[in-house]
């Protein structure tokens, strides 16, 4: 009997299926992140997959508003939205459901969002996010905590070559306000600064009525990138009080991060313009060597919950799980695949003993599968290897005595006999086997 030909079942562009091996790696990454979030005292929150469009849009920046998927609700006729970011959902929940709870709120989430993208770019419409929101604290220590957590997670995932770039929207806003530029000139200037294009910045300033002192400050922006010494150069050219306050804030955060012991992984980028319509203070992005996109990003957003009627200072950040997956897959020395403990290979006609042993081992916490398909020893061993199972247990046959089971280490086919009575003890451990 031949198998029927598979039907065509294409997916829309920008989404993908994750088969067990990659799904295991995603689960591994999420587990590592979740563990750190909880060690720092954050509690999980789960947000819905649908929001009313007007409610969702209240918490989004202009870019994400344009990239949100929208459609009509057949029940109400209102416009619904699939969330393009989880942070506004958390802000809404805190403002409407948790305003009577004591501050600060330490909340974390793990979920997926959907965004319109240019499909020619090959980018994914789906983003897997894992993030935290610290709501109710306006202090350098709160900002530093976000950065320190991000560094701890990246280290915990086995990365050594990575940097976290710090910026500050207050500094950029102060500089831009001092220029007196508006409209298209300001937009072009911000774009040139964001690209670190010094020649474009100078060309724009040559055609605009900006004071020489301010021109010096603006021309310096693309160069304000590096270590802590950047603060001194920025202070030398800063002309506005708001920019100077931002520099003081960054210095305070850096002092606390030095106590956390993460300074070696930090750089300053005071020409960073990301999030000017959303963030209200310190911002940061994390980059792993060899990966072009940021693996995490975040910052302060003191005005977000106010959009839902509840003014509260807040900061947070999120990891892009698929970017982390991409980075891990470039590191063969980092083991991110999930292993299973045991495959039971039963050669007896009676399945009762095999089922009882499997049930007992699961109760002890060992992942245990039964090879129900009838095949020979080598085929079952090959199946275990391909399924990333560490050991195979043979029950029955001539591999050992009748009161024993034969446990084979899949990696090297090394086997050992184990008394079945020992297997059924409550203190039995697979780790004691060779």
Curated annotation (Swiss-Prot):
Gene Ontology biological-process entries: L-histidine biosynthetic process
Keywords in alphabetical order: Amino-acid biosynthesis, Cytoplasm, Histidine biosynthesis
Pathway terms, separated by semicolons: Amino-acid biosynthesis; L-histidine biosynthesis; L-histidine from 5-phospho-alpha-D-ribose 1-diphosphate: step 1/9
InterPro entries: aa-tRNA-synth_II, aa-tRNA-synth_II/BPL/LPL, HisRS-like_core, HisRS/HisZ, HisZ
SUPFAM superfamilies associated with the record: Class II aaRS ABD-related, Class II aaRS and biotin synthetases
Parts forming coiled coils: none
A cellular-component GO term for this protein: cytoplasm
Subunit structure: Heteromultimer composed of HisG and HisZ subunits.
Chain's role: Required for the first step of histidine biosynthesis. May allow the feedback regulation of ATP phosphoribosyltransferase activity by histidine.
Other remarks in the entry: This function is generally fulfilled by the C-terminal part of HisG, which is missing in some bacteria such as this one.
Stated family: Belongs to the class-II aminoacyl-tRNA synthetase family. HisZ subfamily.
Protein name according to UniProt: ATP phosphoribosyltransferase regulatory subunit
Organism annotation: Geobacter metallireducens (strain ATCC 53774 / DSM 7210 / GS-15)
């Amino acid at each position: 009997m031949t198998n029927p030909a598979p039907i065509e079942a294409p997916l829309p562009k920008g989404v993908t299926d994750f088969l067990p091996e990659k799904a295991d790696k995603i689960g591994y990454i999420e587990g590592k992140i979740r563990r750190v979030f909880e060690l720092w005292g954050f509690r999980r929150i789960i947000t819905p997959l649908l929001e009313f469009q007007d409610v969702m849009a209240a918490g989004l920046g202009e870019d994400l508003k344009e990239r949100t998927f929208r459609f009509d609700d057949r029940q109400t006729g209102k416009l619904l939205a699939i969330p393009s970011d989880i942070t506004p959902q958390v802000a809404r929940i805190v403002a409407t459901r948790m305003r009577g709870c004591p501050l600060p709120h330490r909340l974390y989430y793990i979920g997926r969002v959907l965004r319109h993208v240019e499909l020619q770019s090959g980018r994914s419409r789906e983003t897997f996010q894992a993030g935290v929101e610290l709501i109710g604290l306006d202090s350098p220590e709160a900002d530093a905590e976000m950065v320190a957590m991000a560094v701890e997670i990246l280290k915990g995932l086995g990365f050594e070559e990575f940097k976290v770039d710090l910026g500050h929207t207050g500094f950029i806003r102060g500089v831009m306000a001092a220029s007196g530029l508006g409209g298209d000139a300001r937009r072009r200037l911000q774009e040139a600064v964001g690209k670190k294009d010094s020649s474009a910045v100078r060309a724009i300033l040559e055609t605009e009525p900006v004071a020489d002192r301010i021109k010096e400050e603006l021309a310096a922006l693309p160069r304000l990138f590096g270590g802590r010494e950047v603060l001194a150069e920025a202070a030398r050219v800063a002309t506005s009080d708001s920019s100077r306050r931002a520099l003081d804030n960054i210095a305070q955060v850096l002092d606390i991060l030095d106590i956390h012991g993460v300074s070696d992984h930090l750089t300053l980028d005071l020409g960073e313009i990301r999030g000017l319509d959303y963030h209200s203070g310190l911002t940061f992005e994390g980059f792993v060597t060899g990966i072009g996109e940021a693996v995490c990003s975040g910052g302060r957003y003191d005005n977000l919950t106010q959009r839902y009627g509840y003014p509260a200072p807040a900061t947070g950040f999120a990891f892009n799980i698929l970017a982390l997956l991409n980075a891990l897959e470039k590191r063969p020395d980092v083991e991110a695949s999930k292993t299973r403990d045991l495959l039971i290979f039963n050669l007896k006609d009676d399945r009762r003993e095999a089922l009882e042993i499997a049930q007992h081992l699961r109760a002890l916490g060992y992942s245990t599968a039964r090879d129900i398909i009838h095949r020979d020893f080598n085929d079952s061993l090959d199946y275990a290897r391909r399924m990333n199972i560490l050991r195979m247990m043979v029950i029955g046959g001539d591999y050992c005595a009748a009161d024993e089971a034969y446990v084979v280490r899949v990696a090297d086919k090394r086997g050992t006999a184990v008394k079945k009575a020992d297997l059924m003890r409550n203190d039995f451990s697979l780790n004691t086997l060779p």
